[in-house]
């Protein structure tokens, strides 16, 4: 047995092997050592023919899924090796084989999945000058591919990976080598790369894998026919999925090709800082934009919403296509309420279809799908007559499954609690033979009693009885006084003191049927259920198309419900050269999660005289909230949602960049300032005039003058070179002098009010610059001891007298006349040495040596 185990283990070296032995899955050697720690199992040993016993631990087979889930959550792969036959007499070993491999990206059990989130597995192919990545959720069948061929294609690949958030990533050798140095992977923002055979990424092998998967002779319909990188990425992934799942991937029947020019780019920092799908506090949904907007009624709608939020559109036509649908639902309470009620009747059609296609569907799954199918006609009725294109398209893509649904409901019991193991899920009355066998099983006593009565009447033997024993089954017992009346067709089996025992052919036939009824019932129910699953499998594409349409409707309805509740407006999508013009804008999440009335603010940013907003004001006044709310309004508008404002004109944004806050990255030996500058560099290098930038406190991680100089230069570069719409919050009030000097820079401040030495935050933004930071007042609000804040006030007065920043501009010149920072004369080598020397600590000899060194330096400078 151990030899067979070792052979199987060698074929699955990167997995923890669950090896079925009777009622347990056993693990041995290193697998046992690892699993015992991760699963908190008792470690024992087993004789294996070696000098030492093999480490061993095990779990009951019926509890396997919960243990598999724990191992997968810990990043492990699990190979399940099952007994493929029942134990037979004379055969020492039963045949065993690996029936599936469970990895983080291939989990299919409902209990181990978040129903509101896709469980993607991604595959990356990295070439010399371009690359591609694809991602798939095998529970829904969604497969998407994206080609990356810009000069910064590697960064683009990582941006997409962060956005998709796969549970598992595989890739070719070139990508694995690159990923080994990626901070995103080392820091845990992305999972570690799983090894997979390089041959699967060879273009010919990958192409053949895809042709076989989709049963086609060309990949032209999928728009990747001559795209080697996309073919390699997809082919490698499909090969991996087939190898782990051990069955055909029926529901993976299409490839969606995503293009860079179709959607806004959101990098790791933007996704995190804007809290689009997770909050920054604990990484949960609460407090994120997804949490706010997710009022969907179906699990598949919730998953689609998450994808929309992280992939805003950059096509005006497609955005308005969605907005028109939201507007119709927003405007009609009857339509919105009716669809909302009907959607509540829809189960997770996507994942139900996935379980049917991979053979894991239960009778309850099929019945749930039939309930969803029967709810669809009512949705189509509600959409009938709509003149809005997206609503018409949704209606057209919702198919009619009434006949299939009625067949399922006539065949399968509606109450799963009545099911026993492998039986009783087919309704009475659906199959005559099944009904007869159930009657035989459930009323065997009545059947035997009826035969007994018939035999008494035929033979005239009043004492005739039918009984049963384990030796020869049912028999007829006749007392000695009636032996002469026994018919010729009775076959004597046993003589007793008081009479004889007989059998008949009819009785034996009935016995066989009674004793085999359970097995026959099980066989017939399986046959009927297999036919139903086969019928559904034939219609998988129709089910998927319908599920996609219902998901889209669910998201649009969710947008409308949120917009109605919080009084949002329909944004007007304008050309990229138009201004970002929001009247009465609010932060959607802060507004929804606060009991206080949110103070609205306007925003006007264009490509001309007002493209950089310099925002000043004290901490806690609302600068960051204001900047984030405008970025979120961009995102909401471009996913097709109404926005929190009285009115909004939104130009198409290609990327949103954020530079908000920073922490020391000790793992990578990066200080707060280094992290900050890296983020700023990314913005300066990659932002375009179509981008939307929010930068908070640039330069704060270093000395005052260094920080101010950097912040000043960054503003200049953004205004004059990048020309992107920019919100720039700062405590460097000197930057307000740039208005009127650098074209496009405008000053704004968050208003506060001083009352009796205390500050009141008014949260209102207006033109101008703040003349005071109120840092000491904020410190007092935070609970800093009064003795410290009083001392701080005294020091501040002294510093203000010296005016340490007056040298930032040449004396006798107004800011408008000369805004260049005054360059300090560089120090000579001699001056550097003198300034760095502690003269008081020099010995006479050391002083003499220093003078000689300085003399040599001076002579060198004058040669």
Predicted regions and their residues:
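ATPase nucleotide-binding head domains, primarily ABC-like/P-loop NTPase cores
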Residues: 29-32, 227, 297-298, 303, ...
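Extended, charged coiled-coil "arm/hinge" scaffolds of SMC/Rad50-like chromosome-maintenance ATPases
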Residues: 496-534
């Amino acid at each position: 047995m151990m030899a067979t185990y070792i052979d199987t283990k060698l074929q699955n070296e990167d997995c923890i092997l669950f090896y079925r032995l009777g009622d347990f899955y056993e693990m041995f050697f290193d697998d046992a050592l690892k699993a015992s720690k991760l699963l908190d199992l008792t470690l024992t040993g087993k004789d294996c023919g070696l000098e030492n016993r093999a480490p061993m631990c095990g779990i009951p087979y019926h509890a396997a899924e919960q243990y598999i889930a724990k191992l997968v959550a810990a990043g492990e792969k699990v190979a399940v090796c099952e007994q493929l036959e029942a134990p037979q007499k004379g055969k020492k070993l039963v045949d065993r084989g690996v029936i599936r491999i469970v990895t983080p990206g291939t989990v299919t059990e409902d209990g181990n999945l978040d129903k509101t989130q896709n469980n993607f597995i991604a595959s990356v192919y990295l070439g010399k000058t371009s690359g591609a990545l694809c991602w798939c959720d095998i529970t829904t069948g969604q497969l998407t591919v994206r080609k990356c061929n810009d000069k910064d294609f590697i960064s683009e690949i990582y941006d997409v990976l962060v956005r998709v958030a796969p549970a598992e990533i595989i890739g070719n050798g070139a990508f694995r080598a690159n990923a080994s140095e990626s901070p995103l992977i080392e820091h845990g923002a992305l999972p570690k790369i799983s090894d997979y055979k390089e041959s699967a990424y060879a273009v010919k092998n990958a192409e053949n894998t895809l042709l076989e998967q989709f049963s086609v002779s060309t990949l032209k319909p999928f728009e990747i026919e001559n795209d080697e990188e996309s073919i390699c990425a997809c082919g490698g992934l499909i090969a991996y999925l087939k190898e782990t799942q051990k069955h055909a991937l029926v529901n993976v029947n299409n490839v969606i090709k995503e293009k860079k020019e179709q959607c806004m780019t959101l990098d790791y920092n933007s996704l995190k800082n804007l809290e689009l799908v997770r909050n920054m506090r604990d990484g949960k949904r609460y407090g994120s934009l997804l949490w706010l907007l997710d009022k969907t009624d179906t699990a598949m709608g919730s998953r689609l919403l998450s994808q929309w939020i992280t992939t805003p559109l950059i096509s005006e036509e497609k955005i308005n296509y969605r907005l028109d649908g939201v507007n119709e639902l927003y405007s009609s309470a009857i339509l919105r309420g009716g669809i909302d009620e009907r959607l509540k009747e829809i189960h997770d059609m996507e994942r139900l279809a996935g379980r049917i296609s991979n053979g894991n569907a239960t009778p309850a799954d099929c019945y749930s799908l039939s309930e969803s199918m029967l709810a669809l006609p009512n949705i189509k009725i509600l959409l009938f007559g709509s003149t809005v294109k997206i609503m018409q398209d949704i209606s057209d893509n919702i198919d009619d499954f009434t006949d299939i649904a009625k067949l399922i409901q006539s065949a399968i019991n509606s109450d799963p609690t009545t099911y026993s193991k492998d039986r009783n899920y087919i309704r009475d009355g659906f199959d005559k033979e099944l009904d007869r066998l159930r009657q035989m099983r459930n009323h065997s006593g009545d059947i035997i009693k009826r035969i007994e009565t018939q035999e008494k009447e035929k033979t005239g033997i009043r004492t005739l009885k039918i009984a049963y024993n384990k030796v020869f089954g049912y028999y007829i017992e006749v007392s000695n006084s009636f032996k002469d009346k026994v018919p010729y067709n009775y076959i004597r089996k046993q003589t007793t003191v008081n009479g004889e025992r007989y059998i008949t052919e009819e009785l034996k036939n009935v016995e066989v049927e009674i004793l085999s009824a359970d097995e026959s019932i099980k066989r017939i129910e399986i046959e009927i259920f297999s036919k139903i699953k086969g019928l559904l499998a034939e219609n998988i594409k129709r089910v998927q198309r319908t599920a996609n349409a219902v998901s889209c409707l669910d998201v649009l309805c969710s947008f409308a419900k949120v917009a109605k509740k919080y009084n949002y407006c329909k944004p007007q999508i304008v050309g990229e050269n138009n201004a970002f013009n929001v009247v009465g804008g609010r932060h959607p999440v802060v507004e929804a999660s606060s009991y206080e009335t949110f103070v609205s603010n306007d925003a006007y940013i264009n490509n001309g005289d007002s493209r950089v907003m310099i925002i000043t004001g004290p901490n806690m006044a609302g600068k960051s909230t204001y900047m984030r709310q405008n970025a979120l309004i961009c995102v909401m508008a471009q996913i097709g949602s109404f926005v929190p404002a009285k009115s909004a004109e939104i130009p198409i944004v290609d990327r949103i960049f954020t530079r908000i806050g920073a922490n020391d990255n000790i793992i990578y030996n990066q200080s707060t300032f280094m992290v900050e500058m890296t983020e700023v560099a990314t913005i300066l290098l990659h932002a375009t005039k179509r981008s939307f930038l929010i930068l908070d406190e640039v330069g704060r991680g270093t000395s005052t003058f260094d920080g101010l100089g950097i912040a000043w230069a960054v503003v200049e570069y953004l205004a004059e070179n990048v020309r992107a719409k920019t919100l720039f919050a700062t405590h460097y009030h000197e930057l307000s002098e740039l208005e009127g000097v650098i074209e496009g820079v405008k000053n704004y401040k968050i208003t506060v009010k001083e009352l009796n030495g205390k500050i009141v935050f008014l949260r209102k933004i207006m033109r101008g610059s703040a003349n005071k930071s109120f840092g000491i007042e904020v410190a007092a609000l935070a609970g800093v001891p009064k003795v410290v804040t009083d001392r701080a006030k005294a020091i501040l007065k002294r510093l203000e007298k010296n005016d340490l920043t007056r040298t930032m501009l040449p004396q006798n010149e107004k800011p408008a006349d000369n805004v260049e920072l005054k360059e300090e004369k560089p120090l000579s080598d001699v001056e550097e040495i003198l300034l760095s020397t502690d003269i008081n600590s020099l010995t006479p000899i050391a002083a003499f040596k220093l003078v000689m060194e300085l003399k040599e330096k001076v002579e060198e400078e004058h040669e």
